[in-house]
């Protein structure tokens, strides 16, 4: 089983930011990445829809013999990972907004969270805030439209800049000195968000932490791939493969 691939999925290209972190830490692992671009974005979908889509993709990855699945999507994690863990015996690594580390480092006592509508509205997200916030004010900001702009490859357009400015403004007004990028798509806008937010605001995402957790789980199960050559990546998508390849190129993902 050591030479079996790691499975990853996201609503689209957002999980590629996590794949980048995973490749940096585990370069010898083979990966199968499923982009559900035919159903993207997940942010406006119901809990039931997100669970059903996540379950369908899990079956697809299991048919290809993966040894672990990374749910490289905050929205799918918050809505579906509990269900997946209950119904499948394989290990899942999920994405959750980095609320805990953000709360630990804020100086102003205000943390902003940029996320999809479905993430912000989710019960698990509210539980995270209740569990870790304490005296810190956590300000959620739903960002409809950002995922679609990234999926279209508009990383530096005026439309994207205007959208980022619109979503960051309430967080700055509230006094946030730390902003959590609570969607795997958003790290691809890190430079733009940093430019809008200014030098005194820290940006956090959890891609590197997810890569480390994946490494820990594989090591504990003695499933780390012993090969010394660079691992392969197989790309799967429910949408247009040519467009998916074009966006990968735009995002500088092999």
From Swiss-Prot:
Residues of the active site: 73, 183
Superkingdom per UniProt: Bacteria
Broadest EC class assigned to this enzyme: isomerase
MF (Gene Ontology): glutamate racemase activity
Keywords: Cell shape, Cell wall biogenesis/degradation, Isomerase, Peptidoglycan synthesis
SUPFAM superfamilies: Aspartate/glutamate racemase
HAMAP family hit by this protein: Glu_racemase
Similarity comment: family membership: Belongs to the aspartate/glutamate racemases family.
Known function: Provides the (R)-glutamate required for cell wall biosynthesis.
Protein name: Glutamate racemase
Native species: Herpetosiphon aurantiacus (strain ATCC 23779 / DSM 785 / 114-95)
Gene that encodes the chain: murI
